Swiss-Prot record:
Family: Belongs to the RRF family.
GO BP terms, alphabetized: translational termination
Phylogenetic classification of the source organism: Bacteria, Pseudomonadati, Chlamydiota, Chlamydiia, Parachlamydiales
UniProt-annotated location(s): Cytoplasm
Keyword Glycoprotein annotated: no
Protein name stated in the entry: Ribosome-recycling factor
Main location: cytoplasm
Protein's UniProt keywords contain Protein biosynthesis: yes
């Protein structure tokens, strides 16, 4: 695998990590990603909510959690309360419903700030990947493995990848911030 291919793979991973982190940030709409990572105590051991129940959003401001085993509904309700997400689960016999309260302006600003911070972390990560790739290319040149013109071409390709993925991180975060600010 070439240096450029390795770099591209690492940058794609950084972007996927950003998408995953942003999925967990609260918006004004119900989103299963808000609670799927919550740890629930079932059968004597902690498990992620998405591993013990199906999570759906039947309405814009409501989540419906249907446990694979209906006896776990109470444990799921307790686990969501313990997670301190500011959500109040309503437990019935076979499911858990969560009404998503409307976000205040203060919460919107806080969520947008978190979104921006995640984007910046990703861009720093992408630039670190670029630095490591350039160092590897320079090392190969100093060892005589590649020529000067190949080094320059590699550096140019690596910079193009960096620009592309930083722009993609900006676009992803901008879309999420717009989603957060939509009332």
């Amino acid at each position: 695998m070439s240096i450029v291919d390795q770099t591209k793979t690492k940058m794609i991973t950084a972007i996927e990590h950003l998408k995953n982190d942003l999925k967990n940030i609260r918006t004004g709409r119900a989103n299963p990603g808000m609670v799927e990572h919550v740890m629930i105590e079932v059968y004597g051991s902690p498990m992620r909510l998405k591993d013990v129940a199906s999570i759906s959003a039947p309405e814009a401001r409501q989540l419906l959690i249907t446990p694979f085993d209906p006896q776990n509904a109470g444990s799921i309700g307790k686990g969501i309360e313990k997670a301190n997400l500011g959500l109040m689960p309503i437990v019935d016999a076979h499911s858990v419903r969560i009404k998503i309260p409307p976000m205040t302006e203060e919460i919107r600003k806080k969520m947008a700030k978190i979104c921006h911070e995640e984007k910046e972390k990703t861009k720093v990560s992408i630039r670190n990947i670029r630095r490591d790739a350039n160092e590897l290319a320079r090392k190969q040149k100093s060892e005589g493995i590649i020529a000067e013109d190949v080094l320059k071409k590699l550096e140019k390709n690596i910079q193009e990848l960096t620009d592309k993925f930083c722009k993609e991180a900006d676009e992803i975060a901008e879309k999420k911030e717009k989603e957060i600010s939509t009332i």
